Amino acid sequence: MKAAVRYYTKTGNTKRLAEAVAKAVNAEALPISVPVKEPVDVLFLGNSYYAFTIDPEVRDFIRSLDKSKVGRIVNFGSAAMLNSTWKKVKAEAEKVGIAMDEREFHCKGEFKGMHKGRPNEEDLKAAAAFAKGIVG
């Protein structure tokens, strides 16, 4: 199964998760500014809530995806207060005809003194194990 990893981060938390996910699935963690050019079975997409929704750059990235090159999207991320962006990402993925995996990985992320040190080593190991479980 071929996988790609893209992420969007403002704090660096999601990048750390993306690197753990990428290592687990034998891919490279790249920012969403790098398009998905080769066909993949799974696109791991790392993101978080910003101002109570996904960042417009994440929305634009999803809208730019070629459904003939992406089998499905697997969501992952971290946040200090809110939880999953899954529903928001799914809504955008549906607009471009890309399936959204029901499974996702989410953990707490450090922000303005909250959840100091997160994601931590345990979170990174859990993200890697999650990704391995997706690709088999």
Which residues are covered by each model-predicted region?
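FMN-binding flavodoxin-like domain, especially the glycine-rich phosphate-binding loop
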Residues: 3, 9-28, 39-136
